[in-house]
Curated annotation (Swiss-Prot):
PANTHER family registered for this protein in UniProt: N-SUCCINYLARGININE DIHYDROLASE
Protein name: N-succinylarginine dihydrolase
Subunit comment: Homodimer.
Gene Ontology MF term list: N-succinylarginine dihydrolase activity
Lineage, opening ranks: Bacteria, Pseudomonadati, Pseudomonadota, Gammaproteobacteria, Alteromonadales
Function: Catalyzes the hydrolysis of N(2)-succinylarginine into N(2)-succinylornithine, ammonia and CO(2).
List of residues binding substrate: 19-28, 110, 137-138, 214, 252, 362
Pathways per UniProt: Amino-acid degradation; L-arginine degradation via AST pathway; L-glutamate and succinate from L-arginine: step 2/5
Biological process, per Gene Ontology: arginine catabolic process to glutamate; arginine catabolic process to succinate
Catalytic reaction(s) noted: N(2)-succinyl-L-arginine + 2 H2O + 2 H(+) = N(2)-succinyl-L-ornithine + 2 NH4(+) + CO2
EC numbers, comma separated: 3.5.3.23
Hydrolase keyword on record: yes
Domain of life of the native organism: Bacteria
Length: 444
């Protein structure tokens, strides 16, 4: 039976804007109040996803969330018609309206943690949506995320869906952005690496000072239990709090793994050598640990270029390639390092650059835009086929974007009732294109 890693990319929503909501995310905050281009953002994402499908990768798309989120605004006391709710929120709390209008669900690396059937004790593919409690604008996502995942991975013979963890900082969970699965072959049992920023129970552990540590050890352990992962299939690593304070808000900004490759910055982790030894032992050797020294790429350059927020993919010939943002090309130190990397004795033999600037300016690179799902051909056959990228879906979604999306959006536009109507009309049509059923609040 064939096994592979599929990527499910987040389709950028119609309200993509730059509100600077993500404290600790340097790009998000530094581009606050700029005018965005939702149409370009969506097309950049589609182009990247289609390119991977054309390289022979299994590629799907995840639908965006309903925004502005009128349901949440009503929960906090705004009343009347939908237009009244938007108007009241804009006057009383512009920041709250911005949070409820964020298109942040595009970064599906935060949508959920996924464990393949080869790793779990019950032989099922497990999904747990991330609760994202650290950021208001993202904490309103997990219920709809769960609905969308269930509409795509529906067959209970193969797929197990869990509720997101309790909505409390004790269980702060940021999903796959702090999780990477290592294996020798996608169909073999692997080792799942959970990276956390702090421990709630063990206050003797170091923690960042300037920016929040969004992922707790306790959340990572809970997800591993839900997914029925044994101790010899898991490794827990603490992210270096110093790099969190330098803008590394998720581990996928400072490290990325694929199969038997872990690509990471010298400063990424605490107790690095001991933890790499644990990984090597549980993987039974034959690992490539590619450490990028600070002398070649500073943490600042890594964050600015998103060198590690890249995708490492395995091509049909067995070689690996890096999918990088064009920002890596534009940074001299990073570009020089990547040119050197493909000549070294590692499986990584090529780098492909993509323009995802609309996402980058909000603090999300190629890796943020995708959720990885390792699966076999039987499981893939049970996936909703209408979300899988091919020539027809690419053309259909581009037409859909052209029909429904604006080419400029400012934070002032978020209170426009017409934007809400445009967004709902678009999403209603999208659920028909993708055969998702009624996954949104407004459809019920």
């Amino acid at each position: 039976m064939k096994h592979f890693e599929a990527n499910f990319d987040g389709l950028v929503g119609p309200t993509h804007n730059y509100a600077g909501l993500s404290f600790g995310n340097v790009a998000s905050q530094s581009n606050a109040a700029q005018v965005s281009n939702p149409k370009d953002a969506a097309k950049q994402g589609l182009k990247k996803a289609k390119a991977l499908a054309d390289m022979g990768m299994v590629q799907g798309m995840l639908a965006p969330q309903e925004r502005p989120d009128i349901h949440t605004l009503r929960r906090v006391g705004f009343t009347g018609s939908d237009a009244d709710v938007l108007s009241q929120a804009a006057k009383a709390s512009p920041v709250l309206l911005q949070a409820c209008a964020s298109a942040s669900s595009m970064w599906t690396a935060n949508a959920a943690t996924v464990s393949p059937s080869a790793d779990s004790d019950d032989g099922k593919l497990h999904f747990t949506p991330a609760n994202l409690v650290d950021k208001l604008h993202r904490s309103i996502e997990p219920v709809t995320t769960g609905n969308i995942l269930k509409a795509i991975f529906t067959d209970e013979r193969y797929f197990a869906h869990h509720q997101h963890l309790p909505e409390h900082p004790h269980f702060g969970d940021e999903g796959a952005a702090n999780h990477t699965r290592l294996c020798h072959d996608y169909g073999q049992a692997g080792v799942e690496v959970f990276v956390y920023g702090r421990s709630v129970a063990d206050l003797s552990r170091p923690a960042p000072v300037k920016y929040p540590a969004r992922q707790t050890l306790e959340a990572s352990q809970a997800v591993a239990r839900l997914h029925q992962l044994s101790d010899d299939r898991t490794v827990y690593m603490q992210q270096n709090p110093d790099v969190i304070d330098q803008g590394v808000f998720h581990n996928d900004v400072i490290a990325v793994g694929n199969q038997n490759v872990l690509f990471y910055h010298e400063q990424a982790f605490l107790e690095t050598q001991a933890k790499l030894a644990e990984i090597d032992k549980k993987m039974h050797g034959n690992m490539y640990f590619i450490e990028v020294p600070t002398a070649k790429v500073s943490v600042q350059d890594a964050v600015k270029s998103y060198l590690f927020n890249t995708q490492i993919i395995t091509l049909s010939d067995g070689n690996m390639a890096i999918i990088a943002p064009t920002d890596c090309q534009e940074n001299p130190a990073v570009h020089a390092y990547l040119n050197e990397l493909v000549t070294l004795n590692t499986p990584i033999k090529a780098v492909h650059y993509f323009d995802v600037k609309q996402s980058m300016q909000n603090g999300g690179g190629p890796a943020c835009l995708r959720l990885r799902v390792a699966m076999n051909e039987t499981e893939l056959a049970a996936v909703n086929p209408q979300v899988m990228m091919n020539d027809a879906l690419f053309a259909r979604l581009n037409q859909w974007v052209d029909k429904h999306y604006r080419d400029r959006l400012s934070t002032q536009d978020l209170a426009d009732p017409q934007l809400l109507m445009e967004s709902r009309t678009a999403l209603d049509e999208l659920t028909q294109i993708m055969k998702l059923g009624s996954v949104y609040q407004f459809q019920r």
